Structures are given as structure tokens and as C-alpha cells.
A protein has these predicted regions:
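Long, low-complexity, charged/polar intrinsically disordered regions in eukaryotic proteins
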Residues: 1-32
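Short amphipathic alpha-helical interface segments
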Residues: 22-56
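Short, positively charged loop/turn segments that connect secondary-structure elements
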Residues: 51-70
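A short, conserved structural fragment
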Residues: 73, 77-87
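Short, cationic-aromatic polyanion-contact patches
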Residues: 87-94
């Protein structure tokens, strides 16, 4: 199983190795639905849209999709690809 190193904006400098195939599939689905500009969308709204784009062999019935979406979100935020809008609830955009 190939691994990819992910960052976490909540824990700067901290990295974790995760399954590269699942990460890549979720990242593609995530970037396909995250709005290009503020105010963006909530993580729950994006997850709902992502579920239809995920490969069933990796995420059967959406299994573990929430965890992987959060993993990708925090990594993309740490890399500056995705940004949080100010205020509540959490809204994300590119």
C-alpha cells in the first residue's frame, strides 16, 4: 500500500502517512466541489456533493468518507489551497 504524507493546519509541523489511493480519490472529489470564492460551503454541504464522485471500491456506500474528507480539508488548508471564511459556521473555499 502506497502512502502519502499529509499536514494538519490544527497541528503545524505535524504530518501523518495515509493511504495514497484513498487520499487521492478524496482530494479529487473535494477539489471538484469546493467553491472557488468566499463565502464558500460548509464541510457537510461539500461531503454531500462529494459522495456521488467517490469510487465505490474505495468508499463503499460512503464508508469512512467523513474522516477522509476532514483529512483532505486539513491538509489542503495547511498547504494554503483551501481557505476558511471568517465567522461561523465553518465555510471553505479556494
Amino acid at each position: 500500500m502506497n502512502k502519502v504524507k499529509v499536514e494538519n493546519i490544527v497541528s503545524p509541523g505535524s504530518t501523518r502517512l495515509v493511504d495514497a489511493e484513498k487520499y487521492g480519490a478524496m482530494k479529487r472529489a473535494y477539489l471538484a466541489v469546493v467553491p472557488k470564492s468566499a463565502p464558500g460551503a460548509t464541510p457537510a454541504q461539500m461531503l454531500e456533493r462529494m459522495l456521488e464522485n467517490l469510487p465505490q471500491d474505495l468508499f463503499p456506500g460512503g464508508a469512512k468518507a467523513g474522516w477522509w474528507a476532514k483529512c483532505v480539508q486539513l491538509d489542503l488548508e495547511a498547504k494554503g489551497i483551501v481557505k476558511r471564511a471568517k465567522g461561523s459556521p465553518v465555510r471553505l473555499h479556494q
